[in-house]
Amino acid sequence: MWTVPVLFWVLGSVWFWDSAQGGTIGVNEDDIVTPGTGDGMVPPGIEDKITTTGATGGLNESTGKAPLVPTQRERGTKPPLEELSTSATSDHDHREHESTTTVKVVTSHSVDKKTSHPNRDNAGDETQTTDKKDGLPVVTLVGIIVGVLLAIGFVGGIFIVVMKKISGRFSP
């Protein structure tokens, strides 16, 4: 009688054995040193097509790694990356991009004296501003979890019916 639950437990746990093994861990990004050329620039890589700055200040004596913050010489001579324009965009597009702003959804609620903090002296016409949060990620996560649980139950139910049918104990 105990063989069927043990069989279900073993077959159900086989699916998790492969994911429990874990993946291989490669070299950390902090340990990779990008060699710099004479002017401190590295040619673009195949994967990013972006020019990156090399390590110009040498290695840090205490850690043996390249510094992450640009030196004072680099800050004074190079403009920030955000201010550089590409050949594909014109000055008009750049100015238009700077003038656009992102609008947050803000709601206002009036605050009554009854609902305000007792130690605070509030006027009756004061408003409280709050940012409205988007609930879509939470709903999506709950939907995925419920869907996975229903799928496991559905597949388990089919498996139980098939096992009963094979053993001869199933009578519709």
Swiss-Prot record:
Induction: Down-regulated by treatment with puromycin aminonucleoside. Up-regulated during progression to highly aggressive tumors and during epithelial-mesenchymal transition (EMT). InterPro entries: Podoplanin_domain. Disruption phenotype: Mice die at birth of respiratory failure due to a low number of attenuated type I cells, narrow and irregular air spaces, and defective formation of alveolar saccules. Knockout Pdpn mice neonates are smaller, and approximately 55% died during the first postnatal week. However, approximately 20% survived, had normal weights and life spans, and are fertile. Residues 23-141 are extracellular. Residues 143-147 are annotated as: Requires for dimerization and lipidd rafts association. It is a single-pass type I membrane protein. Residues 1-22 form the signal peptide. Residues 100-109 have a biased composition (Low complexity). Residues 49-132 are annotated as: Disordered. The keyword Transmembrane helix applies. The cytoplasmic domain controls FRC elongation but is dispensable for contraction. The cytoplasmic domain is essential for recruitment to invadopodia and ECM degradation. Mediates effects on cell migration and adhesion through its different partners. During development plays a role in blood and lymphatic vessels separation by binding CLEC1B, triggering CLEC1B activation in platelets and leading to platelet activation and/or aggregation. Interaction with CD9, on the contrary, attenuates platelet aggregation and pulmonary metastasis induced by PDPN. Mediates effects on cell migration and adhesion through its different partners. Homodimer. Interacts with CLEC1B; the interaction is independent of CLEC1B glycosylation and activates CLEC1B; the interaction is dependent of sialic acid on O-glycans. Interacts with CD9; this interaction is homophilic and attenuates platelet aggregation and pulmonary metastasis induced by PDPN. Interacts with LGALS8; the interaction is glycosylation-dependent; may participate in connection of the lymphatic endothelium to the surrounding extracellular matrix. Interacts with HSPA9. This is Podoplanin. It comes from Mus musculus. The gene is Pdpn.
